[in-house]
């Protein structure tokens, strides 16, 4: 990314390298062309291991990669912002859940993605759903409804 103003470029670099969000920029073929340090730490990769690679490297499966392309990537390429929860995989193949938001990069055939790790939230939600399901077996439908419908 080239800026005419050196101060703006310096400020952008500081934000890019120090933000609490993971950031990746991909080209029209979904190749990773830039990632920030937070993104690398979240996934356990070194920058050099990601740059130039296809984004498929961070998806949990071929199907997930294709589905993400249809549900998210193509929308962003058509100038529609995207914000969703999606599972990815770390270098060690451990699943990680991201809240991912994407926007097209102005005047380029690239997409800027920002990610936040929501893995613990997803795990907690799943536990609550399992417990609620178990609890529903022991309570009458009326009592269960009064508890969980507010």
Task: Give short role names for the model-derived ranges.
Residues 32-33, 95:
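Conserved hydrophobic beta-strand signature of PAS-family and PAS-like sensory domains
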Residues 29-31, 41:
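PAS/PAS-like sensory domains across diverse signaling proteins
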Residues 62-94, 101:
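Terminal output helix/cap of sensory domains in signal transduction proteins
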Residues 99-114:
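Short loop/turn elements at sensory-signaling interfaces that couple input to output
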Residues 118-150:
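Regulatory cytosolic signal-relay segments
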Residues 6-25:
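Sensory modules in modular signal-transduction proteins
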Residues 1-11, 116-126:
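PAS-associated C-terminal cap
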Residues 37, 49-63:
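PAS-family sensory/regulatory domains
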């Amino acid at each position: 990314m080239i800026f005419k103003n050196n101060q703006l470029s310096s400020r952008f670099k500081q934000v890019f390298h120090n933000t609490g969000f993971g950031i990746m920029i991909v080209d029209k073929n979904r190749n990773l062309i830039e990632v920030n340090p937070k993104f690398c730490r979240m996934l356990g990769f070194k920058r050099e291991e990601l740059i130039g690679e296809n984004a498929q490297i961070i998806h949990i499966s071929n199907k997930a990669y294709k589905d993400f392309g249809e549900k998210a990537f193509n929308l962003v390429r058509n100038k529609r912002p995207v914000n969703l929860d999606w599972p990815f995989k770390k270098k060690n193949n451990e699943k990680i859940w991201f809240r991912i938001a994407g926007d097209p990069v102005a005047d380029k055939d690239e997409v800027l993605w920002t990610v936040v790790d929501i893995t613990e939230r997803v795990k907690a939600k799943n536990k609550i759903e399992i417990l609620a399901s178990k609890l529903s077996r022991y309570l009458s439908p009326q009592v269960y409804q009064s508890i969980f419908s507010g």
